[in-house]
């Protein structure tokens, strides 16, 4: 019950309206002023009597049930409720809002009854025509029900024994059973182990505590069986330290441990069963597609191979019919081209498909003599020392190919000699050549000036005048006998004029300086006609040599310059040699 509008006579300026009795008990209004005119006093009496009559009329409509509480509309208008001076006294704002809400709710209820049930009330007389227009324009649907509002405390008390159940509670239960309203009622629980300790610490009345204990074991209505599983993920701390436990944890996860809920387990079982059956069908369908796709792919590959094979075969046939002719290149690039034949194949543009490998023959280019001289000269310079015996011997015989022979152990030169051996064609020896013959490539290298011979060298039995462009004297019989003991590697030469000699001075640095050699065993295979090693006596048949650019002492010399004179005598006489030092 709400008792309202109990008024006390106050002056006109301090008139309070709409304040409840409960608020006035706690907060009494200000005292009455001493100076009050009789006219105002009589006016206050009339106002108070009118407000009392309004309150009596209004109290007949109010009830304890907030849902059915109805208040008369004329009571608000006739009483002239205002809040002009209530801004300073805001004790009853909540109750005023509640009254306004109830008023609005009553108006909507009356309108709904007029729309859907055609019940006419006092409040909806003015809205009758409008509601008829609304119903005529389109149909209306109304859903009736009772709103369940959860109390703010979080729990509600229910009696345990049937005898203690009140009549109002039985009526509400009967209404809920008859109607289609779905309502959930229960008690709010806290999922914590310390709830009992917290509840005991709270100051409660004894009756409330006893009633709560009774409610914990009470069963209101039981319909079916409810099973609830609480699942949680627990991570073991020792999994990071022990690998076995981590493996066990993965196995448990595969098996579905920990259990989640029966519905989830059933769902997993059904999905596994359905997946097996569906996967078999999918595999059978995909097998046909895969086979057809693979057959088409294989057929495409075979066609591509069949197309590419004639092209490659035709290219090979063309290359065999028309041998590859190498273009003329500078002499300094001969070895580079021959060492990389694949670049020539790619540059020839005869092969249409780059991915195929074409192997064909390649004609050999003539040996570049000047480049070979440089390579051998560099090799000998690296390996020779003052006492070494490595030398390059070049023999300038007429109408005879120049031959190279070296005892160098260089792997590069020997490997090239093995791969590409030079031609060993021997030409007939001819001694009838004029001295004014055009000098050859080696003669251009062996240019020099005449060196005066020492006086003691002129005491030989048959002094021979030295000339510049004469041929070397033939090999004597004594030398032939000496050479025969060496082996079949030396070649016999006929006797010629024994009064010829040569003398030269080295002018070009490219010429290899002669040094005495040591007979080494033949480690590398070569033809018998190769003159790789010369005897010391044959080597000393050369004329006096002077080294103006670089002085390298030979065996038995004591100075930086070496002056030697060699004289050859006919008739197989031994060769004499003299040396002079500074």
Swiss-Prot record:
Disulfide linkage: none
Lineage top rank: taxon: Eukaryota
Positions with biased composition (Basic and acidic residues): 28-47
Location(s) in or outside the cell: Cell projection, Cilium
Keywords, ordered alphabetically: Cell projection, Ciliopathy, Cilium, Cilium biogenesis/degradation, Disease variant, Joubert syndrome
Main localization (coarse): other
Ranges for region Disordered: 16-67, 413-438, 485-512, 545-582
Nucleus is among the record's keywords: no
InterPro entries with a match to the protein in the record: DUF3719 (IPR022194), FAM149 (IPR039630)
Cellular component GO terms, alphabetical: cilium
Compositional bias (Polar residues): 48-67, 563-582
One Pfam family of this chain: DUF3719
GO biological-process terms attached to the record: cilium assembly; protein localization to cilium
Binding partners and assembly: Interacts with TBC1D32; may play a role in cilium assembly.
Function: Involved in the localization of proteins to the cilium and cilium assembly. Indirectly regulates the signaling functions of the cilium, being required for normal SHH/smoothened signaling and proper development.
Family: Belongs to the FAM149 family.
Disease: Joubert syndrome 36: A form of Joubert syndrome, a disorder presenting with cerebellar ataxia, oculomotor apraxia, hypotonia, neonatal breathing abnormalities and psychomotor delay. Neuroradiologically, it is characterized by cerebellar vermian hypoplasia/aplasia, thickened and reoriented superior cerebellar peduncles, and an abnormally large interpeduncular fossa, giving the appearance of a molar tooth on transaxial slices (molar tooth sign). Additional variable features include retinal dystrophy, renal disease, liver fibrosis, and polydactyly. JBTS36 inheritance is autosomal recessive.
Protein name: Primary cilium assembly protein FAM149B1
Organism for this UniProt entry: Homo sapiens
Gene for this chain: FAM149B1
């Amino acid at each position: 019950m709400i008792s309202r509008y109990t008024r006390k006579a106050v002056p006109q300026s301090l008139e309070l309206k709409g304040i409840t009795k409960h608020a006035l008990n706690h907060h009494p209004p200000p005292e009455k002023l001493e100076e009050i005119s009789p006219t105002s006093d009589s006016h206050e009496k009339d106002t108070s009597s009118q407000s009392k009559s309004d309150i009596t009329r209004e109290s007949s409509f109010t009830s304890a049930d907030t849902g059915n509480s109805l208040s008369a509309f004329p009571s608000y208008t006739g009483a002239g409720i205002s809040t002009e001076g209530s801004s300073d006294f805001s004790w009853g704002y909540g109750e005023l809002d509640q009254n306004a809400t109830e008023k609005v709710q009553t108006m909507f209820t009356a309108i709904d009854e007029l729309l859907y049930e055609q019940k006419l009330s006092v409040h909806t007389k003015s809205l009758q025509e409008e509601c008829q227009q609304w119903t005529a324009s389109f149909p209306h649907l109304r859903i009736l029900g009772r709103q369940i509002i959860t109390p703010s405390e979080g729990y509600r008390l229910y009696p345990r024994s049937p005898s203690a159940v009140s009549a109002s509670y039985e009526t509400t239960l009967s209404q809920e059973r008859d109607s289609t309203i779905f309502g959930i009622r229960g008690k709010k629980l806290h999922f914590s182990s310390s709830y009992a300790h917290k509840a005991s610490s709270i100051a409660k009345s004894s009756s409330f505590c006893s009633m709560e204990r009774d409610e914990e074991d009470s069963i209101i209505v039981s319909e079916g069986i409810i099973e609830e599983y609480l699942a949680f993920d627990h991570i073991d701390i020792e999994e990071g330290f022990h690998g076995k436990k981590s493996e066990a944890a993965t196995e448990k996860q595969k098996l579905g441990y920990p259990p989640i809920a029966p519905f989830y387990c059933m769902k997993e079982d059904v999905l596994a069963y359905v997946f097996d059956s569906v996967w078999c069908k999918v595999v059978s369908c995909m097998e046909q597609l895969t086979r057809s796709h693979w057959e088409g792919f294989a057929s495409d590959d075979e066609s591509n191979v069949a197309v590419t094979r004639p092209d490659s075969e035709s290219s090979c046939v063309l290359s065999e019919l028309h041998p590859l002719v190498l273009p003329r290149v500078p002499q300094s690039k001969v070895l580079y081209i021959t060492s990389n034949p694949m670049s020539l194949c790619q540059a020839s543009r005869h092969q249409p498909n780059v991915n195929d490998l074409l192997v064909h023959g390649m004609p050999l280019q003539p040996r570049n003599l000047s480049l070979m001289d440089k390579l051998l000269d560099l090799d000998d310079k690296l390996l020779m020392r003052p006492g070494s015996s490595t030398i390059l011997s070049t023999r300038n015989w007429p109408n005879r190919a120049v031959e190279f022979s070296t005892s160098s152990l260089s792997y590069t030169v020997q490997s090239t000699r093995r791969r590409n051996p030079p031609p060993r064609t021997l030409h007939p020896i001819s001694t009838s050549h004029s001295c004014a013959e055009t000098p050859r490539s080696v003669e251009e290298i062996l240019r020099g000036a005449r060196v005066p011979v020492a006086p003691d060298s002129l005491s030989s039995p048959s002094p021979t005048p030295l000339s510049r462009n004469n041929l070397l004297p033939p090999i004597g019989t004594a030398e032939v006998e000496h050479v025969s003991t060496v082996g079949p590697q030396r070649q016999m030469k006929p006797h010629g004029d024994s009064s010829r000699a040569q003398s030269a001075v080295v002018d070009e640095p490219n010429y290899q300086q002669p040094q005495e050699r040591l007979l080494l065993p033949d480690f590398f295979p070569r033809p018998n006609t190769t003159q790789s090693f010369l005897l010391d006596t044959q080597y000393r048949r050369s004329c006096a040599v002077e080294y103006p650019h670089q002085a390298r002492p030979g065996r038995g010399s004591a100075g930086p310059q070496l002056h030697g004179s060699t004289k050859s005598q006919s008739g197989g006489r031994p060769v004499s040699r003299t040396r002079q030092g500074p």
